[in-house]
Amino acid sequence: MPVTVTRTTITTTTSSSTTVGSARALTQPLGLLRLLQLISTCVAFSLVASVGAWTGPMGNWAMFTWCFCFAVTLIILIVELGGLQAHFPLSWRNFPITFACYAALFCLSSSIIYPTTYVQFLAHGRTRDHAIAATTFSCVACLAYATEVAWTRARPGEITGYMATVPGLLKVFETFVACIIFAFISEPLLYNQKPALEWCVAVYAICFILAGVTILLNLGDCTNVLPIPFPTFLSGLALLSVLFYATAIVLWPLYQFDQRYQGQPRRSMDPSCTRSISYIQPNTVCFWDRRLAVSILTGINLLAYVSDLVYSTRLVFVKV
């Protein structure tokens, strides 16, 4: 099956940085980096699991992140060592860097969320010490995954898979930010009484699905099944997402913080943000903070989609 690849930004690092099907793959720079990822995530979840310091949604997220990253990194190492790239069900041009980008973002979020919403409320002692150490190893893992992305991303003039290009990596970032937005708007009371806010939620969902479909098409080498050329699909998707997010960046803050639309311009006006409630439920985020976070994340994703649109026009596609 012909594969759509891009000429513009990459070094195909899997072939140049590792020796396929050999134990020497672990002694190459990329192999050593993946060993560091494997060890740091393993130590992180082991430290937390040994003292049970992962109860509640924030602790569960951190534990999931470290276990998931450890498991997938182990699979990648096994495939590299066994020379099984041709038998892997997903595109090996696109899968490792896609995972590395997601893993870097996952570990970054855990390295921030876990200590700020969970560890600081633990009593001083062995449990807290283990949690702090786990956070440190999470930071190490984040840096290791980010380094892999920097090493394996596309370089100008080279041929590689789409996910190694700037637009491909931006797709990963866009879906990750959308997932964070979904976490903040998980309480329907934030939006279900105003059609404008419901539209914003629809925007987040539609753009997330479209970006996710793009990633899956590339991971499955299925870009040729589209009824339109893949470059046209990418440009249209980026333009549509920019237009949608442009409406959300106006409507969400307007209806959440403007008193003319029953919004709350000040944090003190939100009963869920009172100090007594925050003390009783330290791991929760009050409604006003959620609204502000979604506003900021909407702006961040809008910038990402604008960059995606600009970079997508600079890609040159070839068939191999």
From Swiss-Prot:
InterPro entries: Marvel, MYADM-like. It is a multi-pass membrane protein. The keyword Transferase does not apply. The keyword GTP-binding does not apply. Residues 25-157, 162-317 form the MARVEL domain. GO terms for cellular component: cell-cell junction; cortical actin cytoskeleton; membrane raft; plasma membrane; ruffle. It comes from the Eukaryota. Its main location: membrane. It is found in: Membrane. It holds the Pfam family MARVEL. This is Myeloid-associated differentiation marker. The gene is Myadm.
